[in-house]
């Protein structure tokens, strides 16, 4: 899912922020409350305690672990809600829609950022054995959908044996459908195509079946037709899960070994890990160890998510649930790690990787004095999002702040939004950048996560520069192919594929420098395709590029927070645009201001902001000086909010605005 | 930072010789056109006097207008065009609204307790509006009588009244002078028919010339001010030059030049945004300001305050009260007083004002507005004194608010002394080269050995006064 539509939603989100500031404080205030109430809230389908002996009734062959994957808005969350209701896990009409998306940012954007699991019990009337209706234990593993989290997705999928591939019956296959399909396919999952929203007047399930056949070689007869909204066709879904998805393959008698899917920090319970038991059984009181860190823990509590924490004291092979083991920070709970019986050597499960940070930006308190508050907020948020890298940095313009590394754009965006929504932090972020590699004539190499840290005049020859790239998939109605090709080539893209997925729609694949898409690529793409384009990307390798550092100078003083790395051929254009933008957003001051973009000591763009002409209040009417004084006080406060470099005051908006330029035409 | 217990009133040169000097002789009226002398602020400073506690000034608000001008956001009462006063203003023509209001105002005057019992009389009275010239002279007299009875009037007080062209004739003005008015502030605003109409003024150019004729011919009235507005919609440089020429030709003793402010809630506020056509651009309107400064200086006027010019000795003493942060009474709708260190603005609506007067009489009103603290006081002093050509007296500022604060202020202004927006002066009010100024700032002990005053330059510093003063605000109240 996400990449595309996620970004589309960010505009909506901004309006919401403007219109509904209270929503903000509400979320901050109510978050802990919800956590509290969720532990034993009766409306969430509390079935009483599920005992360990009950779980023993579900050997691996009675367990199915599956995930739902879809392009954003194709109905994944609604389908999940329906399945939870159908199995009595939650009660219909109780609890909030999009049950598994717990974060405000997930609900607003319709995306999943954190993996969630839910255990359901389902009595299956098998077609073949009409006498026996055994009960099955079904684990729905809700995964993040976006490429930023593709590692997390791959770990979640690794705990599944099958996936429901949900496709909107009217919109058909979109960019993230393709990305998700391949992730599931590469994880060897059984895929059940679900063509959803068939109640729509424009639904064309046959066309979608054709697309599935053409793109994924899926037999049209395998597709289930549903409407999660009206309930039509839903009765086929769980039987298909049981019949078409294999049971988990683990060894029941082996020492316990489990995959860590995701973790949360709970103020009261500490770190809660979601795990899938691959081999053996896990009991309360067991000693377990992490393969990644070697640290050992005692299992303090273990249970299933039904749909909230339900202690069972045990989890058996193939089952999915939670473990609380006295970990103090989610940094100890690395996604994809193998937890195993302590003091035994086990083969770690494959695929574990440390987080890879692809997008970096500086985060600074909007109000310079608030560094401590921001620091506190970041610390708390990283308790729940260990995948962000944080290092302190100082800027001449913005003061003390943090250099943050993110998995990708969406991750960065979500991090910002959570900082604001859940912790009330007001931040200025610098132009996002990617990890470039510069190699010098003397053979030394540096990875550049902050352009300001790169010497403008290094005193030695730059031998080569590399930048990360992505493979982007774009699906568009065919009439937009021309402009999209033009956009991609402006962004230094290289075409890899150009095919038609049906009579109206084209699929384009491009290799693009990551830097070229991190700022405004998607907005532009949406703009030139009347909103029809869907877009997704995956990381690709580094490529050698002709890169230069561009400084922005105000009255000769470089503004470190505005430094950026650009492609040599685009430097002139980007520089010109940046200085023009700055000229617009920096207010006239009592002296002339020159705004320059420079590469090394060579100025490539320049604007002059002439001195302010007048700012005078002519009259103190009838001795009433209070109004005038208020005005001057306001003016003073305005100055206080400015960031200052040398003698030049820079309004915060200038920093926000610069984020919008860096790449566009 | 604020070391001394600060007297509630200003430490600024409170009494200028001009303020106690008798009216300048008639012969002097135009005598000084050549005196565009070194200091634009003609009277030399007098030594600091002990803080004078009781106010010696009173502002009286007379809110009536025929109609509201398009730029105006004052507390006014529009009477409508039918109530143009009959020349001579007999009893029969008196509008009951005016009579009732004056009654109310008189009640306020008598319910106001003088600050001191030892009878410091009023040195200045200012009838502002609205259009005070719409109020029958008989009623103006009753107000002056009430003020005299309550607070006392000095031997030769300055009694100013704002008058609009078209609202008075020679007889009426004579009557006003007869009851004690001795200074007129004539609201001309422009000399172009189109501009007057566009502003929603209730008079035309013909009335302007008539009014000027009446004022200049009036015996016993030597002191009058012409009020102009620059940066009006569609105003061109030629028009502005013409207005200034007409002004100089009319030979007022005082000129007030107001740069149009677009206020929210006014008709102009709905129609225009500052700096956008048909309003002149910032550059043009800055230019208008500079032209006024140039033309009026050439004609012998001192630019003694951001928007005020006068022939030597003809400063508006009442307004000097404001700029020197001295206390003043105020009476009437929406008016603001400054008594015992407390600024208070009266209700802007007639009904609320009437209720307020009632409470004042009953003794049940006590104001919520807190007395200003030292910081506020310092802000006021800086804000007001930097409006004047006299500038900020660093010595007395240091005395009241501490040397280090004065030094910080000077340090903040350092680049602007260098660029010429701010002028540093020695005891003799000679401008200091910025090198000398900077030398003075090297350490606190030396500070003040050379520099004694800072002021904003004319016209460039004045034009950026808000910026410069708000910089100072940032130092005083970070």
UniProtKB/Swiss-Prot annotation, chain A:
It holds the Pfam family EFG_C. Residues 34-53 are annotated as: Disordered. The keyword Protein biosynthesis applies. Its EC number is 3.6.5.-. It is a peripheral membrane protein. InterPro entries: EF-4 (IPR006297), EFG_III/V (IPR035647), EFG_V-like (IPR000640), EFTu-like_2 (IPR004161), G_TR_CS (IPR031157), LepA_C_sf (IPR038363), LepA_CTD (IPR013842), LepA_IV (IPR035654). One of its GO terms (biological process) is positive regulation of translation. Residues 61-249 form the tr-type G domain. GTP binds at residues 70-77, 142-146, 196-199. One of its GO terms (molecular function) is GTP binding. Residues 1-35 form a transit peptide. GO terms for cellular component: mitochondrial inner membrane; mitochondrial matrix; mitochondrion. It is an enzyme of class 3 (hydrolase). Gene3D superfamilies: 3.30.70.240, Elongation factor 4, C-terminal domain, Elongation Factor G (Translational Gtpase), domain 3, P-loop containing nucleotide triphosphate hydrolases, Translation factors. Disulfide bonds: none annotated. It is found in: Mitochondrion inner membrane. Its main location: mitochondrion. CDD domains: EF4_II, EF4_III, LepA, lepA_C. It catalyses: GTP + H2O = GDP + phosphate + H(+). Keywords: GTP-binding, Hydrolase, Membrane, Mitochondrion, Mitochondrion inner membrane, Nucleotide-binding, Protein biosynthesis, Transit peptide. Belongs to the TRAFAC class translation factor GTPase superfamily. Classic translation factor GTPase family. LepA subfamily. PANTHER family: TRANSLATION FACTOR GUF1, MITOCHONDRIAL, TRANSLATION FACTOR GUF1-RELATED. Promotes mitochondrial protein synthesis. May act as a fidelity factor of the translation reaction, by catalyzing a one-codon backward translocation of tRNAs on improperly translocated ribosomes. Binds to mitochondrial ribosomes in a GTP-dependent manner. This is Translation factor GUF1 homolog, mitochondrial. It comes from Sorghum bicolor (Sorghum).
């Amino acid at each position: 899912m996400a990449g595309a539509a996620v970004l589309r939603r960010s505009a909506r989100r901004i309006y919401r922020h403007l219109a509904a500031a209270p929503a903000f404080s509400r979320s901050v205030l109510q978050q802990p409350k919800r956590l509290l109430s969720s532990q034993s809230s009766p409306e969430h389908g509390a079935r009483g305690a599920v005992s360990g002996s009950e779980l023993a009734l579900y050997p691996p062959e009675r367990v199915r672990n599956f995930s739902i994957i879809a392009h954003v808005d194709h109905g994944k969350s609604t389908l999940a809600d329906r399945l939870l209701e159908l199995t009595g896990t939650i009660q219909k009409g109780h609890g909030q829609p999009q049950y598994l998306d717990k974060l405000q940012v997930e609900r607003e954007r319709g995306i999943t950022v954190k993996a969630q699991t839910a255990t359901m019990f389902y009595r299956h009337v098998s077609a073949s054995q009409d006498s026996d209706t055994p009960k099955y234990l079904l684990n729905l593993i809700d995964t993040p959908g976006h490429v930023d989290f593709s590692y997390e997705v791959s770990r979640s999928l690794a705990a599944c044996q099958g996936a429901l591939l949900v496709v909107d019956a009217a919109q058909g296959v979109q960019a993230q459908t393709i990305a998700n399909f391949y992730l599931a396919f590469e994880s060897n999952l059984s895929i059940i195509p679900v063509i959803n929203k068939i109640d729509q007047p424009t639904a064309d399930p046959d066309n979608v079946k054709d697309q599935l056949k053409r793109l994924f070689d899926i037999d049209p007869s395998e597709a289930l037709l549903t409407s999660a909204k009206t309930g039509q066709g839903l009765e086929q879904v769980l039987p298909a899960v049981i019949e078409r998805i294999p049971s988990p393959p683990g060894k029941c008698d082996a020492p316990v070994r489990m995959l860590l899917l995701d973790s949360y920090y709970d103020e009261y319970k500490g770190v809660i890990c979601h795990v899938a038991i691959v081999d053996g059984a896990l009991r309360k009181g067991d000693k377990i160890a992490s393969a990644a860190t070697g640290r050992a823990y005692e299992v303090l509590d273990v249970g299933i998510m039904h749909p909230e924490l339900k202690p069972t004291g045990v989890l058996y092979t193939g089952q999915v649930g939670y473990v609380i083991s006295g970990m103090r920070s989610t940094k100890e709970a690395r996604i994809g790690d193998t937890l195993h019986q302590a003091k035994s050597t086990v083969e770690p499960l494959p695929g574990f990787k440390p987080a890879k940070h692809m997008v970096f930006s500086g985060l600074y308190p909007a109000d310079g004095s608030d560094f401590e508050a921001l620091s506190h907020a970041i610390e708390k948020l990283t308790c729940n999002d260990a995948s962000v890298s944080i290092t302190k940095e100082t800027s001449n313009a913005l003061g003390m702040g943090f250099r943050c590394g993110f998995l990708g754009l969406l991750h960065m965006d979500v991090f910002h939004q959570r900082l604001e929504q859940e912790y009330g932090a007001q931040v200025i972020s610098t132009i996002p950048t990617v990890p470039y590699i510069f190699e010098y004539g003397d053979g030394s190499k540096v990875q550049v996560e902050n352009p300001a840290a790169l010497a403008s005049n290094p005193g030695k020859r730059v031998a080569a520069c590399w930048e990360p790239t992505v493979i982007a998939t774009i699906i568009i109605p065919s009439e937009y192919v021309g402009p999209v090709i033009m956009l991609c080539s402006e962004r230094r893209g290289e075409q890899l594929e150009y095919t038609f997925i049906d009579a109206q729609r084209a699929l384009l694949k491009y290799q693009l420098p990551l830097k070229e898409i991190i700022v405004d690529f998607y907005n532009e793409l949406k703009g030139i395709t009347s909103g029809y384009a869907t877009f997704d990307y995956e990381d690709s390798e580094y490529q050698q590029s002709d890169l230069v550092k561009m400084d922005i100078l105000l009255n000769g003083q470089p503004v470190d927070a505005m430094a950026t790395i650009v492609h040599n051929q685009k430097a002139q254009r980007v520089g010109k645009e940046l200085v023009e933008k700055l000229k617009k957003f920096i207010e006239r001051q009592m002296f002339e201001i020159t705004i320059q973009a420079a590469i090394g000591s060579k100025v490539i763009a320049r604007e002059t902001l002439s001195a302010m002409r007048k700012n005078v209040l002519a009259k103190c009417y009838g001795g009433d000086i209070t109004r005038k004084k208020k005005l001057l006080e306001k003016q003073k406060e305005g100055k206080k909010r400015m960031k200052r470099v040398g003698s030049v005051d820079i309004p915060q908006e200038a920093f926000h605005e610069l984020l919008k330029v860096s790449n566009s035409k | 930072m604020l070391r001394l217990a600060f007297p509630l009133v200003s430490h600024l040169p409170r009494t200028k010789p001009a303020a106690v000097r008798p009216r300048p002789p008639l012969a002097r009226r135009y005598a000084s056109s050549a005196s565009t002398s070194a200091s634009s602020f003609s009277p030399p400073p007098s030594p600091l006097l002990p803080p004078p506690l009781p106010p010696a000034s009173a502002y009286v608000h007379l809110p009536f207008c025929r109609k509201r001008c398009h730029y105006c956001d004052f507390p006014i009462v529009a009477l409508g065009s039918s109530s143009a006063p009959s020349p001579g203003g007999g009893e029969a023509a008196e509008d009951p609204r005016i009579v009732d209001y004056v009654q109310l105002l008189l009640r306020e005057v008598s319910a106001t307790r003088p600050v001191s019992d030892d009878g410091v009389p009023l040195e200045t009275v200012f009838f502002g509006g609205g259009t005070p010239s719409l109020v029958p002279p008989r009623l103006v007299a009753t107000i002056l009588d009430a003020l005299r009875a309550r607070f006392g009037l000095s031997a030769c007080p300055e009694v100013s009244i704002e008058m609009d062209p078209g609202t008075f004739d020679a007889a009426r003005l004579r009557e006003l002078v007869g009851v004690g008015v001795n200074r007129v502030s004539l609201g001309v605003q422009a000399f172009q028919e189109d501009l007057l109409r566009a502003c929603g003024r209730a008079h035309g150019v013909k009335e302007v010339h008539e009014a000027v004729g009446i004022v200049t011919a009036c015996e016993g009235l030597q002191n009058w001010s012409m009020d102009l507005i620059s940066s009006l919609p569609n105003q061109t440089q030629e028009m502005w030059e013409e207005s200034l020429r007409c002004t100089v030709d009319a030979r007022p003793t005082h000129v007030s030049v107001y740069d149009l402010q677009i206020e929210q809630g006014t008709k102009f506020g709905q129609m225009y945004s500052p700096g956008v056509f048909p309003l002149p651009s910032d550059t043009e309107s800055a230019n208008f300001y500079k032209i006024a400064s140039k033309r009026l200086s050439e004609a012998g006027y001192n630019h003694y305050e951001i928007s005020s010019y006068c022939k030597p000795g003809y400063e508006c003493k009442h307004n000097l009260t404001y700029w020197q942060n001295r206390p003043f009474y105020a009476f009437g709708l929406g008016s603001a007083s400054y008594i015992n260190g407390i600024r208070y603005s009266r209700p802007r609506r007639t009904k609320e004002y009437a209720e307020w007067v009632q409470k004042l009489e009953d003794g049940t009103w006590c104001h919520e507005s807190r007395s200003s603290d030292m910081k506020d006081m310092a802000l006021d002093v800086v804000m007001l004194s930097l409006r004047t050509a006299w500038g900020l007296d660093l010595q007395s500022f240091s005395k009241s608010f501490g040397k280090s604060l004065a030094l910080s202020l000077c340090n903040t202004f350092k680049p602007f002394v260098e660029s010429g927006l701010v002028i540093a002066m020695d005891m003799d009010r000679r401008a200091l080269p910025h090198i000398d100024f900077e030398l003075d700032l090297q350490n606190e002990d030396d500070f003040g050995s050379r520099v004694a005053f800072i002021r904003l330059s004319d016209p460039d510093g004045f034009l950026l006064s808000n910026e410069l003063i708000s910089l100072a605000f940032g130092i005083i109240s970070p």
